[in-house]
Amino acid sequence: MEYMKGPATSSQGNILCCQCGIPIPPNPANMCVSCLRMQVDISEGIPKQVSVHFCKQCERYLQPPGTWIQCALESRELLTLCLKKLKANLSKVRLIDAGFIWTEPHSKRLKVKLTIQKEVMNGAILQQVFVVDYIVQSQMCDDCHRVEAKDFWKAVVQVRQKVLHKKTFYYLEQTILKHRLHQNTLRVKEIHDGLDFYYASKQHAQKMVEFLQCTVPCRFKASQRLISHDIHTNAYNYKSTFSVEIVPVCKDNLVCLSPKLAQSLGNMNQICICVRVTSTIHLIDPSTLQIAEVDGNTYWRSPFNSLFHPKQLEEFIVMDTDIVRDRKQAAGAGMRSNKHILAEVWVQKTSEMNTTQQYHCRTHLGHLLNPGDLVLGFDLANCNLNDEFINKMNPHHIPDVVLIKKSYDRTKRQRRRNWKLKEIERDREGMDTDDERQYQDFLEDLEEDEVIRKNVNIYKNANLPVESDTDEEGAPRISLAEMLEDLHISLDATGGEGAEMLTE
């Protein structure tokens, strides 16, 4: 008789659990899973409830010992912060998985599901899943605490200019808005002779000073005051102050240069008009159209002041004009302006129309003036000037009248102005009743100077209709192509109020 031999099969026998006696596959601990978990808790020592600190003002979480970080709910950054709270306890086990369990955002609770493994009796590896509750506790961070205590700034930039108007600061405000340098400021304070910018760090204040040096001719002086000192850690707490002084020369100012400076600028006449102030002072000689630029360092080495205040501008009426065609340029002379036309004009004060007194002068406004036009200028023949340079000049070289700019009807210009500017939120004190007139002067300067407009964001005013670029009088206006659309988040694409946000 033959027997068929089948394939040999091996089967693993079961053993009895040493605790409860149920049959189980053999394992190093000789225990079932239930008994093993009753005997050993691998999550022992890991806290099941932990607190995290959250600042409601800036919506940041505290990462010990003293760092505050921005984290979104159920983000990887927040999960990392939560696991770091358990870092010391998790060092004895192996972390397999971690993830958030959804909780109500307003419940002040965060739940993290952890999966861990650990080697227990006789080399058996046990895996366990459990949940850690994180209680979100409110705590104000140091930065917000300083803000609420009104003693939060660590650096201040004090910008000053020794003039009787604020047109320079209106221009600085617009350039700061264009480059968004106001975002790091904690507070902006406006006083009668300048602006104060407060910052939480010295680096932001230094950045503002560097920007001012690139925008206007200025100089600064830095100082600091010791607030506190920790003798154990040798840490010092300072408050820094940067005092920035802008040159006291503005657009449409009449200045008298020193003979040495005038010679270094191409042998130009000492009496000049400031036509623009950017990072340098732009000067023009109204009798020759010679132009020159003076930077901040050159100005502080050879300073000069304005001979007149803008309120001393007088109104003249043009009686006759004659364009100067033949212009001879002296040896060593500098560049001449191509945007202006030299002319000889006869003018008469509008306040002296009942007399026969007329004045003859040369002007750089030959491309704008016609007989009968009104023009603003300074009367040098009937005034007392207290300036060291002009007092030493030959009286025959001093003109009787210097014309500055053409005069237009201000009321019509304001009514037809279909654009607007944004402003920086700031604290005001010592407001002057003349501020509105000075602001209108600044707006007129923007309309007249295209170079300055390139550094300013100009927005369309939807409340006013769009008209032609020039009016009947020829007053300069800003074209529609130079304006930006003012964005309002609350408006939808059609210009109406947007619909409510869906919450379901």
Swiss-Prot record:
Cellular component aspect of the GO annotation: cytoplasm; nucleus
Question: Where does it reside?
Answer: Cytoplasm; Nucleus
In alphabetical order, the GO MF annotations are:
ribosomal large subunit binding
Task: Determine the domain of life of the protein's source.
Answer: Eukaryota
What InterPro entries is this protein classified in? Nmd3, Nmd3_N, NMD3_OB, NMD_SH3
Q: What Pfam family does this protein match (any one)?
A: NMD_SH3
Membrane spanning stretches: none
Q: Does the keyword Transport apply?
A: yes
- What biological processes does GO assign it? protein transport
Q: Which UniProt keywords apply?
A: Cytoplasm, Nucleus, Protein transport, Transport
Q: How does it assemble?
A: Associates with pre-60S ribosomal particles.
Function in brief: Acts as an adapter for the XPO1/CRM1-mediated export of the 60S ribosomal subunit.
Protein family (similarity comment): Belongs to the NMD3 family.
Protein name, as recorded: 60S ribosomal export protein NMD3
Question: Which source organism does the UniProt entry give?
Answer: Xenopus tropicalis (Western clawed frog)
Cite the source lineage.
Eukaryota, Metazoa, Chordata, Craniata, Vertebrata
